C-alpha cells in the first residue's frame, strides 16, 4: 500500500502561527488553517517537529506526533508484540494480519502499534490541526532509517469528516478500530495535559454513537471499540466479546471469522 494523503475539504480553522516561517505558512494553507492573532492555539516548528501549543497555558509542553522516539518506540520494541490486548482485539494471529481503518486516529499511537505488528492501517482524522500533526509525524517517520520503509507501506492518512467517506475507497477493510474521546478519570500529568489540550481543541466526541453503524458497514470482519472501563457500550450495542485491560477495555463486534 502506498502512503498517500487524501484531503477532504473542511471549513477553515483559525490558528496562530509565525507568518514569517514559510513552512508553517504552507502547512496552514494546505490544511485550510487561517491566521488569527486571537486564536487559542499556536502551531510551531520545534526541533523539526510540528507542535501544538495552548496559548493561555504557556508552561505546557507542545503536543506533537512522534512515531520514532519516546514511548511509542519503547512500546514497539518491548510492548509485548502480538500478545498485546489491542492485537488480540483486532484479530492478529499467526498467518492473519488484517487491514485496519482507525476511525479516530488522534495522535496515531494505537495505529502505529498495529502497523508495527504488520497491519496496514488507514488513519482517519477529521480535525485539520490534528491531521496536520499526523502528517508531520508521518513525514519524520518515513525518513527514519529504522522504520521508514515499512511505515511507507503500512500507514496512510485520510482527512475526512466521517467513516462514511472512506466507503468510497476501492479497498476492502477487515477491521475498523474506534477510540472515541471520553472524559478521563485518570489524573496523571500526561493524560491531564493531552486531554486538556485535545478536548479544548476538538471538543468531545458527541457524535461517537453515530460511528458504530458506518463502522459495521465498512468492516468485513470486525469492529473494535476502545473504551474506559467505566464507559457504557457504544450506541448501547452489546459487543460480541470484551477484552479487558487495567484501565480500558476493547469491545469487539464480530461480523466474520478471521482467515
UniProtKB/Swiss-Prot annotation:
It is an enzyme of class 2 (transferase). Its main location: cytoplasm. It catalyses: guanosine(1516) in 16S rRNA + S-adenosyl-L-methionine = N(2)-methylguanosine(1516) in 16S rRNA + S-adenosyl-L-homocysteine + H(+). Its EC number is 2.1.1.242. The keyword Transferase applies. Signal peptide: none annotated. S-adenosyl-L-methionine binds at residues 109-110, 125-126, 161-162, 179. It comes from the Bacteria. It is found in: Cytoplasm. Keywords: Cytoplasm, Methyltransferase, rRNA processing, S-adenosyl-L-methionine, Transferase. InterPro entries: 16SrRNA_methylTrfase_J (IPR007536), SAM-dependent_MTases_sf (IPR029063). GO terms for molecular function: rRNA (guanine-N2-)-methyltransferase activity. GO terms for cellular component: cytoplasm. Specifically methylates the guanosine in position 1516 of 16S rRNA. Belongs to the methyltransferase superfamily. RsmJ family. This is Ribosomal RNA small subunit methyltransferase J. The gene is rsmJ.
Amino acid at each position: 500500500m502506498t502512503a498517500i494523503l487524501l484531503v477532504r475539504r473542511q471549513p477553515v480553522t483559525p490558528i496562530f502561527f509565525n507568518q514569517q516561517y514559510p513552512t508553517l505558512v504552507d502547512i496552514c494553507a494546505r490544511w485550510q488553517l487561517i491566521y488569527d492573532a486571537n486564536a487559542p492555539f499556536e502551531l510551531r516548528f520545534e526541533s523539526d517537529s510540528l507542535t501544538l501549543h495552548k496559548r493561555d497555558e504557556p508552561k505546557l509542553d507542545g503536543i506533537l506526533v512522534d512515531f520514532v522516539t519516546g514511548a511509542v518506540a519503547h512500546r514497539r520494541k518491548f510492548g509485548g508484540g502480538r500478545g498485546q490486548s489491542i492485537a488480540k482485539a483486532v484479530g492478529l494471529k499467526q498467518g492473519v494480519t488484517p487491514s485496519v481503518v482507525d476511525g479516530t486516529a488522534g495522535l496515531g499511537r494505537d495505529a502505529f502499534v498495529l502497523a508495527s505488528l504488520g497491519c496496514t492501517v488507514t488513519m482517519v482524522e477529521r480535525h485539520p490541526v490534528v491531521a496536520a500533526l499526523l502528517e508531520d509525524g508521518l513525514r519524520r517517520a518515513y525518513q527514519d532509517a529504522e522504520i521508514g520503509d515499512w511505515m511507507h507501506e503500512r500507514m496512510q492518512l485520510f482527512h475526512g469528516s466521517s467513516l462514511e467517506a472512506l466507503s468510497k475507497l476501492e479497498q476492502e477493510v477487515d477491521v475498523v478500530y474506534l477510540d472515541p474521546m471520553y472524559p478521563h478519570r485518570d489524573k496523571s500529568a500526561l493524560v491531564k495535559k493531552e486531554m486538556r489540550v485535545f478536548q479544548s481543541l476538538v471538543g468531545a466526541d458527541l457524535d461517537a454513537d453515530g460511528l458504530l453503524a458506518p463502522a459495521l458497514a465498512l468492516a468485513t470482519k470486525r469492529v473494535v471499540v476502545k473504551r474506559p472501563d467505566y464507559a457504557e457500550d457504544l450506541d448501547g450495542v452489546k459487543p460480541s466479546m470484551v477484552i479487558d485491560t487495567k484501565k480500558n477495555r476493547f469491545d469487539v463486534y464480530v461480523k466474520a471469522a478471521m482467515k
